[in-house]
Amino acid sequence: MAEPSVLTVIPVLNEELHLDRCLRSIRSQTLPRDQHRVLVLDGGSTDGTREIALQHVRESISGEGPVVELLDNPGVHVPHARNLALKKVDDESHMFEIIGHAWVPPEHLENRLADLQEAEAEIGRSIGSMGTKIIPEVTGGLWGESSIEALLSSPLGGSGQFARFKGRSIAESPAFCLHRVEAIQDVNGWDERWVVGQDRDLNLRIAKAGWPVMRSDASYLHMAKRRSFSSLWGMGHRYGYWRARQASVSVSRLRVREFLPWFGFLAVICGFALSGEVDGSIYLSLYLVTSYASVALLVGLLEAIRFRHISLILGVPLGLVILHISFSLGLLRGGLKQPPPANERVKSANH
């Protein structure tokens, strides 16, 4: 039986701040050179991204790690890049999906392949997708940046790709998957309608086609997150919008917890509105507001203890409020089928 091989796919657009670290981590993988190849797909960067990628292309020719290739991505967005990479598969058995502002330890792919083979031996069949764990890095930087990093790994702010977990298990939305090429081809690749949430959509379709979709803590990944609360607002609004748009395909893709802020807000408004007619309704509203604030502050305290960063006591609750409001407004905007919000991370991606 042939050894598994990996095509690492890196869609980029104006990633000069992080791409060098990403590519150095990928080129430092312990996986043998003949089992690993790297494709960087540029969506039209206007900064130094292409120059950084080309430098790694040149270095990889005579280096010990995988060969790095740079391709243009006329479609600009992530799903277009990944479908283009799918067409460029040679004899690789798996595709590793990463982004230009993420990086991994040297044994990442080797450990994940070994873990994947062990899991397949246990269940007696091939696995379609195996996700990994995102580990936060709170390094004492800017208050907003540290708060967002902690927030997205917290119980209230982190779910889906940012979820905390241990071991190996079935998952609905695993992060940075190692996909079996055959499984991707089985569902005709990524749906290019979804410029956000395309990986969750892919994994749902892979699972529906009968392939196991799992996650494992056999390795981990670091990712540069938003650096300000204004960019967190933009992220939440954009993600909420596209989640609602994907619900037009299947309502089952929405989760009840995503509507809890709306339920709470409407309950509070009703309580105040009915205070003159229904005894105790105003106290219900005050109870809901106080409970939310208390839980948010408790999460902030726990994250401050976890990261030993006292400013997170206020930063995490503030981030939670911003994330919940922006995501909820995004859901409303998407449900009303209004034009999509702008990309807060890369302005040139808006067209």
Label each residue range with its predicted role:
Residues 107-144:
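Conserved donor NDP-sugar-binding/catalytic core segment of glycosyltransferases
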Residues 72-90, 111:
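Glycine-rich, basic loop-to-helix element that forms the pyrophosphate-binding segment
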Residues 191-254:
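Catalytic donor/gating beta->alpha subdomain of glycosyltransferases that bind UDP-sugars
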Residues 42-51, 101-105:
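A conserved acidic beta->alpha catalytic loop
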Residues 24-35:
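Short, acidic, metal-binding catalytic loop of nucleotide-sugar glycosyltransferases
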Residues 264-339:
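Membrane-embedded multi-pass helical conduit in multi-pass membrane proteins
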Residues 92-103:
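Short beta-strand-to-loop acidic/aromatic patch adjacent to the donor-nucleotide binding site
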Residues 132-138, 148-170, 174, 249:
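Short, flexible, basic/aromatic active-site loop/helix in glycosyltransferases
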